[in-house]
């Protein structure tokens, strides 16, 4: 039977519940267990797909096309699994589904209430996460902080699930903060005690308490928390601030967290703790020698979480070369043809990531022009690819005013236009081309060198595509279309072979990169940037 672990948080937000959950998932996976993980978000949006990156950070896309919380990126990268649409559940999604059922008459005229209808819907989605993956263990992070009014239906649902499935199949992990009071020179357990008291008042007794702290805890502090929170002493787990997130699984393992969970849930682990690969990764991370400077030219650079997976993928790509990646955050609204060199002259590579909307698009085009004309390694993602074709059309083909129909509906040369199936769609939410699609690679191209194969699969999130009316012109003037959909209709990758490294893709490769397995395009981009740096 599938076992369920619930991770809650108290005292303050941003305690690292997601990292704790994904680190535990990694430990259990390395013990030979089939693990999946999900996030319950208490906000009323159906998904984060239409939310501003300034509000929510990046939108992470799964293989099956779900637009999800950025924490799912942490989960996938840490545990090295591919998640699905059941891995992110929002209050908006739950309420929307219940109200649709009510309108259909599924409740036979009954009064629809938070209990049992909303809580039952939450529990159903919890069970689907396990059923859809045949998981031995489902780890569920509850967003928000214990006591928040928005998360109460989720807390009630996970309380009920213990009665539904049996105590031996359910475990509760609570993350808290142990603040250090500088004036007193000591750490205080009272916030943890009150947080657990709040959780117990809602009917949940934690089995494990993970304590976030700046300093090493004494055994007396652990004993005090165990006494007042009514748990075993060994079930108080210290989680110290770390220089690298990759240290967290090792911290938890050293305190036997995986053993405690396996024993408590009576799991059949196939192996003893195996963290050799993880230790090798951490050794590389802690011994990087030198850095490569990448200019990331974007619209949302004031909130770096908007590009979280891109940043992580760049870091992954630096590890094989033992190089740290220094990201130069460049606000594209400030870049012009005239001042591009001021921002980009000393970078080793230029990356233009995805985005939506007209604002700051001209600055991205100026950055792409600078990369092309000065032979600086360039990598464009999604909108970055679209604007690479726009820049080429304007400055090489001479099509003045060329643009994307998304950004300039009145453009005389719509190099980028709506996907045909999108033309009659008015809603924004959930209507993009989303998820994993195949791409055919053209022989003899940089793309083939990068991937080493003719067919690939990558995740997508876009509504507009390259307009094939301009395909012949671009190819006749030196831009190679190196990747397409299998039917040849949709342009997926472009490159300029006369440059040392100039490649762009319609898909989002950052969603498939792993710390121990960098994505091929990112790795090749960093390799090219390193060569460029060495040849300066």
UniProtKB/Swiss-Prot annotation:
ATP binds at residues 14-19, 71, 240-242. It catalyses: UTP + L-glutamine + ATP + H2O = CTP + L-glutamate + ADP + phosphate + 2 H(+); L-glutamine + H2O = L-glutamate + NH4(+); UTP + NH4(+) + ATP = CTP + ADP + phosphate + 2 H(+). The keyword Magnesium applies. It comes from the Bacteria. The active site is at residues 382, 508, 510. Keywords: ATP-binding, Glutamine amidotransferase, Ligase, Magnesium, Metal-binding, Nucleotide-binding, Pyrimidine biosynthesis. GO terms for molecular function: ATP binding; CTP synthase activity; glutaminase activity; identical protein binding; metal ion binding. Allosterically activated by GTP, when glutamine is the substrate; GTP has no effect on the reaction when ammonia is the substrate. The allosteric effector GTP functions by stabilizing the protein conformation that binds the tetrahedral intermediate(s) formed during glutamine hydrolysis. Inhibited by the product CTP, via allosteric rather than competitive inhibition. UTP binds at residues 13, 188-193, 224. Residues 293-535 form the Glutamine amidotransferase type-1 domain. CDD domains: CTPS_N, GATase1_CTP_Synthase. Gene3D superfamilies: 3.40.50.880, P-loop containing nucleotide triphosphate hydrolases. CTP binds at residues 13, 148-150, 188-193, 224. Residues 1-267 are annotated as: Amidoligase domain. Mg(2+) binds at residues 71, 141. Its EC number is 6.3.4.2. GO terms for cellular component: cytosol. Pathway: Pyrimidine metabolism; CTP biosynthesis via de novo pathway; CTP from UDP: step 2/2. Pfam families: CTP_synth_N (PF06418), GATase (PF00117). One of its GO terms (biological process) is 'de novo' CTP biosynthetic process. NCBIfam families: PRK05380.1, PyrG. CTPSs have evolved a hybrid strategy for distinguishing between UTP and CTP. The overlapping regions of the product feedback inhibitory and substrate sites recognize a common feature in both compounds, the triphosphate moiety. To differentiate isosteric substrate and product pyrimidine rings, an additional pocket far from the expected kinase/ligase catalytic site, specifically recognizes the cytosine and ribose portions of the product inhibitor. Homotetramer. Belongs to the CTP synthase family. Catalyzes the ATP-dependent amination of UTP to CTP with either L-glutamine or ammonia as the source of nitrogen. Regulates intracellular CTP levels through interactions with the four ribonucleotide triphosphates. This is CTP synthase. It comes from Staphylococcus aureus (strain NCTC 8325 / PS 47). The gene is pyrG.
